[in-house]
Amino acid sequence: MTNKPFSPRNIFAQPSVNSSRVFLSPQRYIQGPGVIKNCGLYLSLINAKNVGVLASKRGFSAEASNVLQSLSEAGIEYSKAEFMGECSREEVEKHANNLLNSKPDCILAVGGGKLVDAGKCIAHRLNCQVGIIPTLASNDAPCSSISVLYTVDGVKDLVEYFPQNPAFVIVDTEVIVNASERYLVAGIGDAMATWYEARVCEDNPVGSNLVGCRPTLAASAISEKCAQILFEYGVSAAENVRHNKNSESVEKVVEANTLLSGIGFESGGLALAHPLANSYTEITRLNKKYLHGEMVAMGTLAQLAMENSEDLEKVTKFFIDIGLPVNLEQLSMHPLKQFEINKIIDTAFKNPLIHHMKFEVSRDLILKSIKKADELGTSYVCKYGDEAYRRLHG
């Protein structure tokens, strides 16, 4: 079993070639209605004979049951591992130890973002490949070679990197459209940050992606396409999912949330939006009430405010239309609660990714950016209303 941390920067970001460009992606991406029923067939591509299936208790009685049936039909043996809800070191080590004796040649992670990240961690420890079957389009975790681990209380703990991206990602849009609209919208919030952060890394001569190298043209193009798809199809896709209906808009947005954003953030790079979003997890009540993409949305607005970007108003209006938070009140915070805001700023300031911005970032600048975005969001709520947000948040 492998417990040694992996650092891609030690491989790719050597001082002698510090201007190298590196592109990462999953080996295979499969999306469409009903594809989950063919996962046994897809596993034949990697000659899998013995699989560890990670799912929640609910998942094993729902989507994962189709996975198990497909594995049985393909003659693939499997062991079940029940995920308890938090991608923590304790949860990962427990499942890695329990699955060790069965010697799986692949881990299948069937579920949401934290389960997906746990599956990647488990596969790394067991020295086997990982296949991802997301049941939500709420974040861009499925395609990357990265996992975010949290404490048992849900506070961000650390980021783990892996030598390989998933062997395949299987996205069944029949499953996605039967989940809550709020999950798709949160995924849009996560994915919208991709272009704005990648753009910063591309424009900054010392900006880098998540393996410490310069972004490729492909990563930048994919990131930009991601934002274009969201602006054009996001509102209609959310409306379709609200009625559990698949459509071309849904297919496009699911691909943007999952594949385009997944490649874009890892190969294109991060800037302020994600470090700020991850800092919101320092406030316990936010962990319990809000999804990752909803916090990323607020981080994106703050980053655009910091840049004095002409896109700030466009993105704020889009977030209002789709139902994402645009001010601190919609994230159960208040601009006058300086202690909480300072805690978030202090955590974000420790993250080296914020220095991908093309100018020096100070605590005071982060504070001013948060407040600028909050004030614009508040004024836009007064002007355009918050019907979509209230519908999603009851």
Please place each PLM-identified region on the residue numbering.
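Active-site segments that bind and position negatively charged phosphate/pyrophosphate groups
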Residues: N209-D321, E329
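ATP/NTP phosphate-donor binding region
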Residues: T2-C106, L328
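A glycine/threonine-rich phosphate-anchoring loop and its flanking beta-alpha core
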Residues: H124-A218
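C-terminal charged capping/lid subdomain of soluble metabolic enzymes
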Residues: T2-P15, S309-G394
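Short glycine/serine/threonine-rich phosphate/pyrophosphate-binding segments
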Residues: I36, F60-A64, K114-C121, N139-C143, ...
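Fold-independent oxyanion-binding glycine-rich loops
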Residues: P33-G34, S56-K57, V110-G112, I133-L136, ...
